[in-house]
Amino acid sequence: MRVTIFYLAAGNSRRFGENKLLYPLDGKAVYRHLLDRLAKIAGRHENWELLVVTQYERILEELAPLVKAGRLQTVFSPDSEKGISYTIRAGIEAAEKQNADACACFAADQPYLKEETAERFLESMEMQKAPLGCVFCGGESGNPAWFSKPYFSELKELSGDRGGKKVLKRHWESVIPFLVEAAWELKDLDRKEDLCCRDTGGCHE
C-alpha cells in the first residue's frame, strides 16, 4: 500500500500570538519535533512518503536539505491562510500525483506525539486497510487521522476552515479507532500556556 504521510504545517496561529510552528521548544522549532520523528518512520517503510504542506517560506527553506536528501517532499500552499481546507486540498492533490492509496494527516502543532505511537497508528491503519481512521483518547477523537483513496474527492471539496473531521463524521460507521492512553501526547498548542514539556519530562524523541 502506498501511503502519503501528510504533515499540516500551515496554520495561522491567531490564538498563539506569533507563529507557533517556529516557536522554540526544547532546542528546536515546534514543527520540527513531530516532523523529525515522522521522517524516521517514513524512512523505515518503503512505500510511505512524507509530505509537508506549508504557507511559510521559512519552513520551506529550512526543509530544503531534507528534500534534497530524499527524506521528504514539500508543497507551498499560500492559500492556507484562508483556512485548513486549502492546506488539505494542496496535500491531497500532491498525494494523488504520488498514486497514494491512503493518506494520514498529522498536525505540526502536536510536538509531544511519540514516535512509537505515530508508527503504531500508521501500521495499524495499513494492516487493517482502514477506509477511515483516527486516534481516540478518553472517548474523544483527534489527530492524526487516516483517509483512504475513495475519500480524497470529499477532502478536496472541503471549504474555508473546515477540516477532515467533517468527512470522518459523515462516514462515522467506517472510522477505525486507534486508542491512545496518554492524553498529553495528543495535546496541540493553541496558546503559549499550552506548552507542557515541563509536565511530560520533555519532548522525547
Give the location of each predicted region:
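Glycine-rich phosphate-binding loop of ATP-grasp-fold ATP-dependent ligases
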Residues: 18, 141-143, 186
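N-terminal glycine-rich phosphate-binding loop and ensuing alpha1 helix
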Residues: 2-55
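Conserved N-terminal catalytic core of the sugar/cofactor nucleotidyltransferase
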Residues: 33-101
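Short aromatic/basic micro-patch
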Residues: 24, 112, 146, 188-189
